[in-house]
A protein has these predicted regions:
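Short, solvent-exposed loop/turn segments at secondary-structure junctions
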Residues: 24-25, 95-98, 136-138, 150-151, ...
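Short, structured patches in soluble enzyme cores that scaffold and shape functional sites
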Residues: 94-99, 110-112, 127, 131-135, ...
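Non-heme Fe(II)/2-oxoglutarate
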Residues: 41-46, 52, 198-203, 207-270
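Double-stranded beta-helix
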Residues: 139-208
C-alpha cells in the first residue's frame, strides 16, 4: 500500500488515516481465530480486566506464526517507511480484546506520552496501526479521536493506576474539553469515531489524543495494534518488560502481500 500525496497531507492535518476493508474476509477470519486462541492462554503477556476477562495480549507476534506474518505485512509496513523516510521496527504489538459486556474504558491519552516517559523514546517518530478483527460499531467501544490534537505536541498527563487494571498516562478533563472545542468541524463535532467492517485499518500519529468507551454490548471489538517506530528513534529506557516495549530494533523485513491469504487457505485445506 502506497500513500498518495493527498493522503499524506490529510494525515499531517488530521493526525490519522482510515482504510476500509484493507484485509480480506479470509485473512481476517484467520486472524480472528488466532486471536480467540491467544486470548484463552494463561500467560504473563495476557493482561486482564478487573473482572478477569482478557484486556490486552502483548507481543503475540513472538509466539504466534499468524501474528508474526501480520507484524511484517507490507500493507502496514510500507506506509510507515514512507512517512518516516526510513526503516521501522516493532516497538509494541498488542491485541486489545474489548470483550462483550466486560471490555473496560481506555481513558483519554496520547501514546507517545507513554513511549517518552516510560520508554525514553526520543521523538514521536512512531505511530500505531489498528487492524479491526471484529466489526467496529458506534456502540461497542470504538476508538475516538480528537482530530488535529497531535499538533499540540506532548501534553501534560497524570499517571492513572486505579481506573482500570492497566496503568496509563491520561489527560485531565479540562485539557480534553479544550482540545475538543478547538477541533470542532463544520458539523459541530470535535470528536470522530471511525467505524467499519473487519479488515479495516486506522493509522494514527503518536501524539493524537484518543480514547475508547467501555463495551456494554453483546458485540466484541477486537483490534490488533502495531506500534512501529523509526529505527533511528529507538527507545533508550527499559523500565517496562520486553514483551511490552521491545528491545530488538532490527528493521522489519516484509513478507509477501499474499502471505496471510496463503496461510488461511492452507489452514482451510488441512
Amino acid at each position: 500500500m502506497h500513500l498518495s500525496p493527498e493522503q499524506i497531507g490529510k494525515f499531517e492535518e488530521q493526525g490519522f488515516l482510515f482504510f476500509p476493508n484493507c484485509f480480506s474476509e479470509e485473512e481476517i477470519a484467520l486472524l480472528r481465530d488466532e486471536a480467540e486462541r491467544i486470548l484463552s492462554f494463561d500467560r504473563q503477556e495476557i493482561w486482564r480486566e478487573k473482572t478477569g476477562a482478557p484486556r490486552t495480549a502483548f507481543a503475540a507476534h513472538t509466539f504466534s506464526d499468524v501474528f508474526a506474518l501480520l507484524a511484517r505485512h507490507p500493507r502496514l509496513i510500507k506506509p510507515m517507511r514512507q512517512i518516516f523516510g526510513e526503516d521501522v521496527y516493532v516497538h509494541q504489538f498488542k491485541l486489545n480484546a474489548k470483550a462483550a459486556f466486560e471490555g473496560d474504558v481506555w481513558q483519554w491519552h496520547q501514546d507517545y506520552g507513554t513511549w517518552a516517559r516510560d520508554d525514553g523514546m526520543p521523538q514521536p517518530r512512531a505511530m500505531n496501526i489498528a487492524v479491526f478483527l471484529d466489526e467496529v460499531l458506534p456502540f461497542n467501544g470504538p476508538l475516538m479521536f480528537i482530530p488535529k490534537s497531535h499538533k499540540y505536541g506532548t501534553l501534560a498527563a497524570g499517571h492513572d493506576t486505579s481506573t482500570t487494571s492497566y496503568p496509563l498516562w491520561t489527560l485531565d478533563n479540562a485539557t480534553v474539553t479544550r482540545l475538543v472545542a478547538e477541533a470542532v468541524d463544520a458539523a459541530g463535532l470535535g470528536i470522530v469515531a471511525p467505524t467499519g467492517k473487519p479488515g479495516s485499518v486506522i493509522m494514527f500519529h503518536g501524539n493524537l489524543v484518543h480514547a475508547s468507551p467501555p463495551n456494554i454490548t453483546p458485540y466484541p471489538r477486537k483490534i490488533v495494534y502495531l506500534t512501529l517506530c523509526a529505527v533511528s528513534n529507538h527507545i533508550t529506557r527499559f523500565s517496562r518488560p520486553e514483551w511490552v516495549a521491545h528491545r530488538d530494533f532490527t528493521p522489519i523485513q516484509t513478507v509477501d502481500d499474499d502471505a496471510l491469504l496463503a496461510r488461511a487457505r492452507a489452514a482451510a485445506a488441512e
